[in-house]
Amino acid sequence: MNNRRCFTFLAVAAALASGLGLHGAMAQDWPTRPVTMVVPFAAGSASDTMARILSARLSEVLGQQVVIENVSGAGGMTGVARVAKAAPDGYQFVLGGVDTFAQNQTLYKRPLYNSATDFAPVALVVEQALLLVARNDLPANNLQEFIAYAKANQGKMQYGSAGVGSGSHLACAQLNSAMGVDISVPQEAA
């Protein structure tokens, strides 16, 4: 089974296991109109890609279109806050993660929502690893060589992340600190 097919299967299985496929058992018909899945990161991000795969199958299961809306900003906080303030009618939900529901609560002095009281978890859809990758012409073939290269080229290296305050940004900052290097300039999302 190829990776995309396996990923799609796991995402759909998680959604079905969460009860989304059991709409006939609900007291009222739902959904009767399209449902919006807010992705708190830019189009093309890992979260966006996952949401698009998941929404296609959810649309089939629910019998209504699941529309993706990318609302990025503040490490995902902007999109999540939008859903926190939306009418509690079940027609808008957010695809978030550790960065949007745990990190932001401690990273910002005044987060725009309370993860513990404004939201209820529905399903674990995917677990995602962060990878350290570089161009194949970088003269480093392992982590030890990468650290040595980064130390020898302080301030000259850059990394890409999902944006300031995102999980990938904080992971890079932690890596910088652990390695004692200055790899900077998070690239802005599209």
Protein language model regions, located:
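N-terminal export leaders
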Residues: 3-9
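Sec/Tat signal peptide C-region and signal peptidase I cleavage site
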Residues: 21-27
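Extracytoplasmic "Venus flytrap"
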Residues: 37-50, 72-74, 161-166
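Short, polar/charged alpha-helical segment
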Residues: 47-63, 169-177
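Hinge/capping helix and adjacent helix->loop/strand transition within the periplasmic-binding protein
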Residues: 85-91, 106-190
